[in-house]
Amino acid sequence: GEDRIEFKNAMKDLGIGMPRSEVAYTIDEAVKIAEELKYPVVLRPAYTMGGAGGGMVYNVDELKVVCERGLQASLVGQVLVEECIFGWEELELEVVRDADNNKITVCFIENIDPIGVHTGDSFCSAPMLTIPEDVQKELQEMSYRIIESIEVIGGCNCQFARNPETGRIVVIEINPRTSRSSALASKATGFPIAFVSALLACGLTLGDIPCGKYGTLDKYYPDGDYIVIKFARWAFEKFKGAEDKLGTQMRAVGEVMSIGK
């Protein structure tokens, strides 16, 4: 996750919902925020990878321990204290934008495990299998507004949470770079996200890059007639003292992808 304050302000300007949250720079600030949001809460350190230093806490004692760890893990000493939305659907889109503001969606990814399990540990499918088409279009529209606002050139991973009972959608975070999810999306679709991002960074546009049956990349859309399922590989037995438990910190050491119809 990058700067949580900048991200929160940007989403507010766009009118895109987020989980209720506040930023803390000290343990005392985090304690005060958690009391207002009510336990349990989730702590998300800024500028970390794989959810390092964060986690869900159920009381003030747990908060102090995790917050101290998170502040140390964050490059800027910043932790987001966030309302708990565990159990919601977790949905991801891999999108690409060029300097002319052309935007395409490479892949729709549905996490089979709900919010609360890190995406790197979650079973997931591409394309989305249980999410209505109108919801997918809404997520795509939000993703395009986000990457246009922050002026991403290249690939970007956008992560959302959806309450299956009320339909409420919030954005959790984005990764404005080639990420672990980008690697999965590339393998699932055959779309070379990192390579294309490099070309776009050099000044080309999506319309300049040829792409098989689509003609050029600006006309690309995900239309595979197959399903991809990813599941994680863990190695708890190799790490002394490691707890065999999943949460907001990524535990997987690898992953396996299967393709079928």
Ranges and model annotations:
Residues G1-G54:
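A conserved helix-loop-beta module that forms one wall/lid of the active-site cleft
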Residues L14, L37-P40, G50, V57-K261:
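ATP-dependent carboxylate activation and anion-phosphoryl transfer catalytic cores
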